[in-house]
Amino acid sequence: MGELTLVPKVTSRPLDTGSWGRSTTITGIAHRGNTVVTSGTKPGGTEDAPETSRKVPAGAGLRSWWPVAVPLVVVLIGAWTYRWVDEDAFINFRIVHNLLAGHGPVFNVGERVEVSSDPLWMFTLAVLHTVFPVSLEWTSVLLGLVCTAGGFLAGGFAVARLGARHDEGTVLPLGLLMVSVVAGVWEFATSGLEMSMVFLWLGCSFLLLVRVEARRAGALPAAVVAGLGTLIRPELVLGAGVVVAALVVVVAAPGWGIEKSRRWRCSGVVAAALALPVVYELFRMAYFAMLVPSTALAKAATSSWWSEGGTYLWNFVSPYTLWLPLALGAVIVAVRATAWWRTGDRLGVLVLCTPLLVGLVDLLYVVEVGGDYMHARLLLPAFFAVALPMYVGVRSLRGALVFPSIGIAVWSVVCLGWLRFTPPPIAGLTPQTVFISNERDSWVSATGTAHPVTATDYGRALSGRAGTLLARMARHVPPGHQELLVITNPFAPIDPSATRPARSTLPFTLAVNLPAIGVIGYLAGPDVYVYDSYSLANPIGSHTTVARHARPGHEKLVGPSWMLARFGVPGTTTAPGGPSTVTVAAARLALGCDPLAAYLHAITGSLTLSRAVANLGNSVSFTTMRFSPDPAVAAVQLCGPQVARP
């Protein structure tokens, strides 16, 4: 098949550089071998869909892709060198085990609370663990490497296509090189968390947008992929919206067939993007009786804390001097966007800048909510996105592009060899202390292994040993009995003799309150009900109000009084230093009043069709329900001021 070329004919008017289409007034004849394809304006104002919108030399993309191998190899070597699984990943592992055991995608058996905020990642792990005889821990590590590689390849192919269409020669993906040398990226390329899938989604979304704009086809599959972002991380709904908006602008441009169908094309893109997220949202409402994951409520994801968010941003930028390569990369993008704009390539500029907009909206959200307690983690999507369009072509490497390109290359070498994040020492640590940690280094130290991946590795840490002890305690509970363990000092060893009788319709043998639920919960097993003191997996605590800002993700700290009120046997004593009987009585009163009582019934009762339908209708009120973490205050709020305080 011959190479596609465009032979311009006489135009009826000068090129309109202000339109969003490319050379829409030029009528051309496309030659491919002995075949002639015409494109242009028909009488009546309709247009033929052109075979292609830009000259792309055959094989140009293949010839220019090889520089992607450099950042790809660097990031994979770094990720493997830093391979590990974060303690939080074991939350998903426990959910996967419960799912595969037939209990549903839940953290505590018998209680439908959505603790996983990354359902696509979690379900992918479940499928792979079912198909391949590999432990969940190593499945997550290997999947992370594959997704990271896929994200880098997709992003590299995207800029290679852009460079080939503009005849820039071999493309140097400086932005991907910039990302590949940052140690924070290496840590979360594995980690067992969903960040690698975010890289894959960003790279594929950019690549598909480039292909759609170039080929004037394939918009619906691209929209479906864009919509998947919300199933990887909730806040990616912002970036997904930007990508879908860009797709709508592209399909609304001339060159897509009959003009009268423009509205249907745009509607189709939006519908395709929303299809899977809407289906899952309906499932979430019917199954979990909520509009958002429990983790979103527990982390107060709608509250503002700009000052801490700024601190979190600087904590990521400063150790690697990221402001320097990002500023240089911005110059590269600005020079290219300006040149394309002047030639009338408005859609090309839109495609080029879409990843920048995705990164900026994600960055603003993360900073607005106060960031995270893990160094770099929540800023990596924005970093990867804004770096995607930062590239240079060998033929265009002149003038204003030379200095920024050399600067990024030199910085990359320095960052690769020397720039690392070292957290400052923390004095007087309390559960409410605000600090940003290097989670990998912390767990390397706690487990005594260079690569903490498996449950066996974590079993060497205090939390791992505690989980193993709880599993053993649960096995020794007499058949038909339930026990309750109240931990008043999370830093003290667990006392197996401190258990008290419990009663509940939930199928557990031992219930315990814990400040960390990942490794402990995973090793404790499904027979242990984990009452999460920080509310991620706590259907009561996640709906409490935030008294004051604390460490991001750890603001809703609730005491064991709610657990005693829900599962304890009235009249039994509690552990020394535990909540008073008055406080427990107030919590028990609050638990009996709607909407809290109705919500707990909705997520613990049998999931019949009628209950699923009722959950759909009640999910809004259940999601917006809030009350004080203080049981005495909550009793008045939930039961009404006419109820006397106990």
Pin down the residues of each PLM region.
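Short, intrinsically disordered terminal tails adjacent to the first/last structured region
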Residues: 1-60, 64, 642-646
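Membrane-proximal envelope and lipid/glycan-remodeling enzymes
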Residues: 39-44, 51-646
